[in-house]
C-alpha cells in the first residue's frame, strides 16, 4: 500500500510496507490532535506532537491508564481479565514498580555484565561459523532471549517456545507471527486472554505451572522473587494469580521484543 499521506491509520494494512511516515507527517502539521473513525469500533484520538505527548504522559488524572491502554474496544469483563500494572495510575502503579525495582537495580544490572559479555561472545562465535547468516535471528534475537531466560529464571529449554509465543502475542496483527489475526478472524474465544490471542492462552497455562511449582524456576530469577515477595507484602495480597499471569505475559513479550530491536 502506497503512503499518499492519507492512509487510514486504524487499518493494519496501512503498515504493511512500514510506518506510513508521510501520513503521520501530514497529521502532525495539519491535525496534531486527530480523531480516527473506525469501521468496527468507536474510534480513537491520536496525540502526534512530542510536546503534547509529554504533557499527556504527565497528567494521569485527566489521561488515566486505569480504564485501559488499548485501541481495541473492551468490555468490562475483558478489561478486568487482561489487566496488567500498565493499566494503573499512581499510587498503585508506583507501589508495584517499587516491589520490582530491586530486581532491576543498577547493582543487579552490573552483576549481569560478565554474563552478557560471555553470552554475546558465544553467540557471535557460533554465528560466524557460517559465511552468511541472518543477524536478527542469530544474534539480535538470540542474545535477549538468553538473557531474558536468566533474568526470569525459566528453564533454558523453554526459551525458544516462550519467545515464539511472545512474538505471536504482540504480533497479533501480523500473519508472520500469529496464527490468528485479530482484525481478520473471529477471536471471540480468546477475548479474555492477553492481546485476544491464542498465544496468551498458552502463556497463561505456562504461568499457572510456575505458580503451582510444576515449572522449575531458578531462585536467582525475578519470577521466584515475585512469587515469594510480590504476591504478599506485609500480609496483604499485592498481586493475584490472574495479575501474575498477565504480568508474566508482559515480561515475556515486551522484555524480549524491545531489547531485540534496541
What does each model-found stretch correspond to?
Residues 1-136, 145-200, 209:
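Active-site substrate-recognition loop segments, prototypically the cytochrome P450 B′-helix/B-C loop
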Residues 20, 53, 140-141, 145, ...:
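Short runs of predominantly hydrophobic/aromatic residues within well-ordered alpha helices
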Residues 117-120, 163, 223-224, 244-245, ...:
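Short, well-structured alpha-helical segments
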Residues 128-132, 216-218, 232-238:
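Short, glycine- and charge-enriched coil/turn segments that flank and shape catalytic ligand pockets
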Residues 141, 194-204, 232-262:
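Central I-helix of cytochrome P450 enzymes
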Residues 145-150, 224-231, 246-249:
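Contiguous, well-ordered alpha-helical segments that form the cores/surfaces of helical PPI scaffolds
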Residues 155-156, 211-220:
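Proline-centered turn/helix-capping motifs that create local helix->coil transitions or kinks
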Residues 196, 200-205, 209, 219-231:
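Amphipathic alpha-helical interface segments
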